[in-house]
Amino acid sequence: MNDAIGRIIAGESPVFLLIAGPNGASKSTYTATRLTPIGFPSVDPDKVALEMLGRHPKTREEALTATIESTRRVRHNFTERRSIALESVFSDTKGHKLALLNEAKTQGFKTALIFVGVDTPEICIARVMDRVDRGGHDVPDELIRSRFPRCFENLKAALEIVDLAVLIDNSGCYGVDGGRKPRDSDDGRGFGFFLPDVFSLTS
């Protein structure tokens, strides 16, 4: 785990941790390998959908129902002043996740963003195809492509809100471009090393 994230989690204030990034960027892998082993609670809308439906959503309405329930669970933790993480593709156009970050700050939570990014939507599409081959859920290619730039636009806005942000370049995972391992970084303020590339992708 990034040292800065470890420090904020170990602090006295409750923490709202948003794990964001495009489809197939390995957000759930981050949760499973970094947060679950230390007992940090998290909400994954995909898992919530499985709990509610017994399968992955097939319609927009079903996906929205899982999203609403996920938000309800996060807000319950806000009320109880308990730390919580939420996974998100971070592509909504109405700013709901940004509003959650602001809501958490208003209620005295520390806010942290883990952004798991990749270079292109084609990497996301390849990852999702691999996930489907292994029994995971599918996401249409065009939906992945349309979400990709919105995800980075929301990242820009989130960086103005959160107390800490760490950006993870996961483009090389699974050997997509030569087998590089995922990298994460922060510069003391918590802003990741590939931030200039983020802005160039959305400018």
Label for each model-derived stretch:
Residues 16-35:
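Glycine-rich phosphate-binding P-loop
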